[in-house]
Amino acid sequence: MVPHAGGSALGRLGEEAASAWYLQHGYEIVQRNWSCRTGEIDLICRRGQLLVICEVKTRTTDQFGSPFEAVTSAKRRRLRRLATLYLLETAPTTTVVRFDVAAVQGGSVEVLENAF
């Protein structure tokens, strides 16, 4: 399981903006676009013993709903499973895992910590 550069140009720009937000707030970017055959985690960040699994949603308009609305219950379940696989593979010494959603829209980044 290796990171890869997938997704659209807009999605990559959103991931760059979200990464910058986490760096500005004292996090280390551990991995971007970590993937396995069952899916991908956009961002994995660390601050101390806290590991953050972040889903990044980028929108240019609200025409199809807010970025936060795009993270469905099915997507949340899939991210939990992916996080488990990541933890089993990497065996980090993390005591706490948190799931965030980063919404990137109109040049701004809003992070919902502990989104689920």
Predicted regions span which residues?
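Acidic-basic catalytic patches of nuclease active cores, encompassing PD-(D/E)XK
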Residues: 1-32, 87
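A short, N-terminal amphipathic alpha-helix
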Residues: 81-88
